[in-house]
Amino acid sequence: MPKQLQVTEQEKIRREKLEELKKLGINPYPAELFPVNNFSSKLIEDFEDKQEVIIAGRIMSRRIQGNASFAEIQDSKGRIQIYFNRDEICKTEDKTKYNVVYKKLLDIGDIIGIKGSMFKTKVGEVTVLVKDFTLLNKALRPLPLPKVDSEGNEYDSFTDLEQRYRQRYVDLIVNSHVKDTFIKRTKIINTIRGFLNDRSYLEVETPILQPIPGGATAKPFITHHNALDIPLYLRISDELFLKKLIVGGFEAVYEFSRDFRNEGMDKNHNPEFTILELYVAYKDYFWMMELTESLIEKVCLEVNNKTEIEFDSKSISFKAPYERISIIEAIKKFTNYDISNMNESELRLICNEMSIEVDDSMGEGKLID
């Protein structure tokens, strides 16, 4: 028999509310257009008193105070405060929409659409006066929102790394900085693509399923092609196919590819990942250095509007050109070890002295890396 879904007490209550909404003739999941015409961040930045707006978002907090209530909704651009007044929403004697639907049947996590007008509270906070609202999506599971005590200490935050990775959709809702990372990643890829396209480099797509896994040393994922009755491998690299295109007559090709490696994993190593590979004919690694400098500077400027960033309490400049130094010189500069004439056993001894984790499979090259 299939395993029965375990439902928490909160989830039971939300399901009961769902049925109550249906009894009132309210569709909790309407497949209809809701004509959003603005976003939270724009309304805050370009505040205009009494401006009529239509917005939508997820309820993230509520403060119910009798016939009037404040709440906060979150859309794709940020959060904004909204103000519910019973008599503004319910113009007739029937106060069900406020007294029952809003106060009793809505929960944090529900998505609502709002029609209203802009104003500022006495303390100057930009707020939407709700004139009408529509339930767009009833959430059946509570959000893992943190609790804050009177002294501002936060508890029960959604910080477990394993859970965050497995439930990215929840992570995006409750940790706003994660959404910023997604947005920056897209900006980075778009900037790189534009940079290479401006130089007339050709973006291509190469096979993901390959008869021979090549281009790197890694353990592949294996599958089977039923029609041909042959084993195939998810690519570990797109290098060989890109080089074949150069052989075929293209002088500059690149690809953003999804590669797969059936090996160990941690927060920095995923079994599937995106990689950029670029091949250009008639160039050398000095030319590639210059291209890389220009590319990284361009990306940093486009994403951060400046070429200098703060990381781990340090200021890092991505303004080209960069210092060029050999790996042997770099090791000597930062560790005071001259490894230019060292053998494998001597390199291994230095790694142990510096508490660098190594194993017996590593040769001179890996130890230097």
Residue map of PLM features:
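Class II aminoacyl-tRNA synthetase catalytic cores and aaRS-like
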Residues: 1-369
